[in-house]
Amino acid sequence: MQITFLGTSSMVPTKERNQIAVFLSYGPEGILFDCGEGTQRQFKIAGISLTKVTKILISHWHGDHVLGLPGLIQTLSSMDYNGKLEIYGPTGTKKRMEKMFEAFVFDKRINLDVKEVKSGILFENNDFQLEAYPLEHGIEILGYRFVEKDKRKIDMKKIKKFNIPDGPLIGKLQRNKSIEHDGKKIMPDEVTYTEDGKKIAYITDTVLCDNCHKIAEDADLLICEATYSSKLVGKSEEYGHMTAKQAAQVANKSNAKQLVLIHFSARYKNTQELEEDARNIF
């Protein structure tokens, strides 16, 4: 698993910060959280091929979160992208995608699967699930949660104790099935242990609300907006955003292990003030 922060600015990009986009690479899956203007260029700078993107999770349709979509899709079409690009977003996403294709001329179309999400699990396979929950920003908006499934791991010291050779027997134990070896029945719990799956939470463009805590609950990594410092809490509430202090409060209350702040107002040339706000709490 690898997470790349392609953009951390809010509505206005700066020389140092691109509009919002966060990329989660997990095995064959490449999950892009939001796609602000200039995202495809950030992929190039990060040395990540656009063809790695398999899913795009749109929080909402304010321009700074989606202006990179047309360019990214156009470039993928020129690269003979052979996969199916899944795009998830709040109610209205299908119509907005249709309008986008009406507005721009695409010489070639890629295989798209656009899905609208309300609340709950939006995708699940044997390795992980994706969840979405509504936030509060004055328009349809979602926060997202990546939940890796727990994994059964082999304890090699115990395997050696039972003299179990490499091969299908170990695979069977890893699949939580008992085996027969040297006349003995060996149960999975005797030679394996469970490794907890990782949880990644993504929250942006919202006032503090109950679902912030639901999304962030027990997260190994909470990625949370911090548009303003606590000095501008009034402005933050007026425009439907959170302060760095509030992000830290969410992390604390939700038992998150790590917090990464994103979505900074362009007024901040550096993030020191925002970091200090958060560190005083978390």
Question: Where does each model-flagged region fall?
Answer:
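Active-site-proximal loop/helix segment associated with metal-binding centers of metalloenzymes
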Residues: 14-16, 126-202, 206-215, 221-223
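Metal-dependent catalytic neighborhoods of phosphoester/phosphodiester hydrolases
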Residues: 68-75, 100, 269-278
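Conserved beta-strand hairpin/beta-sheet module of binuclear metal-dependent hydrolase folds
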Residues: 1-46, 82-84, 144-146, 192-203, ...
